[in-house]
Amino acid sequence: MTHPKAPGFSRGITETMIRGLVDAFYAKVRADAVLGPIFEAKIHDWEGHLAKLTDFWSSIVLMSGRYKGRPMPVHAAIPEISNEHFVRWLKLFGDTAEEVCPPQAAFLFKDRAMRIAESLKAGIAIHRRAAATAS
C-alpha cells in the first residue's frame, strides 16, 4: 500500500515503475564487467532477489513497508566490495532511472540511491575496522 505522504507518491511513482526500474537495472548489472561477477557469485535466485529489491525500493519511495531485510550485514559480508563498485552501481542505477522513469521520479531514485550507498560504505568501513581490530 502506498502512503499518501511518501516521497514517490507526488512524483507519480508506481509499483509497476519500481519493478521496471529494478528489472532493467539488474539486467545491466548482470552484464557489467565490474559488478556482474560479484552479483553472479552471490545471487542464486534472481527472481527472488528482484522481488526483494522491488519491495526494498517500494518501502523507500512509497513507504509500503514491504521490505523486511537488513542490507548492511549482507553487504558487509562481501569482502570484494570496494568504492569502485559503489561508483559503478550508482552510475548504472542513475542511468537506468533516467531511462525508465520521468525526471522527477528519476531524481528521487538517484537521490535515495546515493544516500543508501553512502550509508552502506560507512557501515562496511566500520565493520572492516572492527574485524581488523579483533584479529
Regions found by a protein language model. Name each.
Residues 1-135:
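Core of compact, soluble alpha-helical bundle domains
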